[in-house]
């Protein structure tokens, strides 16, 4: 099966917001027992998987897109398969952890995916997930990214609780700085991307180049990190979940 999306190679897949979110996930990954087997679902272009492997874990991946799985095999040498998150082609308890970043919101059957994640995680293992938060923040960016939903905190907790996992953390992130970035920069860019081809738009090409500037991305990420000063506020554009399988 081949699945492609217009947003899959856009600058924000490489830019500061994406890098910041990967850092949030990795802060939890590094708490896992060393050397374990980690499934990244969906693996996408492999940015998270590469970091997980670099931290000393054995990485496996699944994605609905053949191109994504092939790219990861070639670029990382990791085992990556094409498949459906509601029917994971792995045995029960195969992994010490599953990571899933900005994926559940795309699925018609997110509950089925949560049950499958719980099935393939070993007893005592963890799922580390990020999703967009709060219906009140729905925008044209969600339409552009083909989201099915944004999550309330309790909805995410119940999703994994009903799948048989114990939620250890369900925390908002990204307020106020990332949310301001989303509103003032990312939303106008996504509206423009929805109407125009990057190859024919000088402004979008400039944004793409900026999104690949390590210095600029690092600077903006440092600014985003200031959001941690406001982490006590139960609000933000994203949610981080850590859930553990009862064992």
Model-derived segments and their meaning:
Residues 102-106:
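A short His-aromatic
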């Amino acid at each position: 099966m081949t699945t492609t999306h217009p947003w899959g190679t856009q600058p924000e897949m490489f830019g500061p917001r994406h890098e910041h979110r990967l850092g949030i996930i990795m802060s939890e990954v590094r708490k896992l027992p060393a050397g374990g087997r980690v499934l990244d679902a969906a693996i996408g272009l492999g940015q998270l998987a590469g970091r997980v492997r670099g931290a000393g874990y054995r990485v496996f991946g699944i994605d609905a897109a053949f191109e994504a799985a092939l790219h990861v095999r070639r670029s990382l040498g990791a085992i990556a398969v094409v498949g459906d998150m509601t029917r994971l082609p792995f045995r029960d308890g195969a992994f010490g952890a599953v990571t899933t970043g900005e994926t559940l919101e795309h699925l018609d059957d997110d509950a089925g995916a949560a049950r499958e994640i719980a099935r393939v995680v070993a007893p005592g293992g963890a799922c580390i997930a990020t999703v967009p938060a709060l219906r009140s923040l729905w925008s044209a960016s969600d339409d552009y990214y083909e989201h099915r939903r944004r999550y309330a905190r309790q909805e995410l907790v119940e999703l994994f609780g009903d799948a048989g996992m114990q939620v250890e953390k369900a925390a908002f992130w990204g307020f106020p700085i990332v949310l301001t970035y989303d509103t003032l920069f990312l939303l106008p860019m996504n509206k423009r991307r929805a109407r125009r081809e990057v190859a024919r738009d000088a402004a979008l090409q400039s944004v793409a180049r900026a999104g690949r500037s390590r210095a600029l991305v690092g600077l903006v990420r440092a600014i985003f990190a200031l959001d941690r000063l406001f982490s006590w506020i139960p609000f933000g554009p994203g949610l981080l979940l850590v859930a553990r399988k009862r064992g």
